[in-house]
Amino acid sequence: MNKTNEITLSPHWEDRISNEQKLRRNDQRSVFQRDRARILHSAAFRRLQAKTQVHGPGSANDFYRTRLTHSLEVSQIGTGVVAQLKLRQPEFRALLTSTSLMESICLAHDIGHPPFGHGGEIALNYMMRDHGGFEGNGQTLRILSKLEPYTEHFGMNLARRTLLGVLKYPAFLDQVHSTERPQEVTNVRHLKSIDWHPPKGVYRDDADILNWILKPLSDVDKALFSTFRFQQDSQNTHRKTRFKSIDCSIMELADDIAYGVHDLEDAIVMGIVTRNQWQESVASKLAECGDEWFEANIETISDKLFSGLQYQRKDGIGSIVNALLTSITIKPTTFNDEAEFESELLRWNAFLSPSMSYALEVLKKFVGQFVIHNSEMQRIEYKGQQIVMEIFDALNSDPERLLPENDKREWREAKESGANAHRVIADYIAGMTDGYAQRLYNQLFVPI
């Protein structure tokens, strides 16, 4: 293994798939500063302000987070992680040179999520079951590299390392899909979401992009990078990829912290969770998580979170975020007895300490149990799921009549070339905000 103070990276990680020539007088920005600007100014990013995070836009309470504010918070946490890693482990500064790179990855990480959150994702996956499936992370890569009209054919034309950082699951959906497909339903209202959760990965339609991203890697690294975390323990279980780049590992930790802590704050403010639920399901476990700081301060943090005073609650939330963030370190991706990656971007990942990893899992499980799976939230998700499936069914019945002109042209081109025309319909729906999807549904199905 190379010494970490001798880390060097191939210049090809700053390549773009298209060697564009933009009219930008005296532009002194770095590659990753330009990537950040492209993402921030994109229509796909703006639409996140009207897409469900946990509580759908239009809720009676305007305090909650949307996909947009969540992405901004993930970016803030991600850059905070990079800053503290540079101080604690200066030998890795050559790997963590650009704050703009981490901002770009974090800002873009949710850009492919469809309207109505996971309900919309399940709906599109079901409707695309015979045409390559649908998954939010795969859609993110597709938007960044093909769909967003910053360029004619290459989406935002982001740098290779930025796309590698967004690539959470480096395998095709059909490679990780369960061997046994659930039973189809005769009525979409009878669809059980648990049966149609998509596997995590990249569409076969985007094989060219995945191959381009991984091109600088050796054949050995490519093979190791695409291995799975575990074998399927049943025919109905999707497999998961095991590895990701160091940038992606930081983004994923930032995403998990934002989900486990900031979505918790929304739930407290809106009265969805109580102090007793918190005490029984979280505080009692964090008091014994093995982290001395948490064990000593969890009671004080609990008092602040449920004090009813906004500044106290914010201080409690900030304390948890800081405790998690400062427990992250860079370690080798593989274990001592395993083959190691040749690429420095894959050889190292960011990890929480074991005790704080457990603490974060407790927080995420609490949010999942009392917020995500709250019956009111599930009814809203179910409604969105039905809206998306009904829209897809209508558009697919007569695309040349119902699709907008640009999408109609893309659909025709796909049909004529033998490409996946159903993907065009999925792309159109996935790009909708919750409100736009609701209005289109009303136009199609609500009597005048």
UniProtKB/Swiss-Prot annotation:
InterPro entries: dGTPase, dGTPase-like, dNTPase_2, HD/PDEase_dom, HD_domain, PHydrolase_assoc_dom. Residues 67-260 form the HD domain. Belongs to the dGTPase family. Type 2 subfamily. NCBIfam families: antiphage_dGTPase, dGTP_triPase, PRK05318.1. One of its GO terms (biological process) is dGTP catabolic process. It comes from Aliivibrio fischeri (strain ATCC 700601 / ES114). PROSITE patterns: HD (PS51831). It comes from the Bacteria. The keyword Hydrolase applies. Coiled coil: none annotated. Keywords: Hydrolase. One of its GO terms (molecular function) is dGTPase activity. This is Deoxyguanosinetriphosphate triphosphohydrolase-like protein.
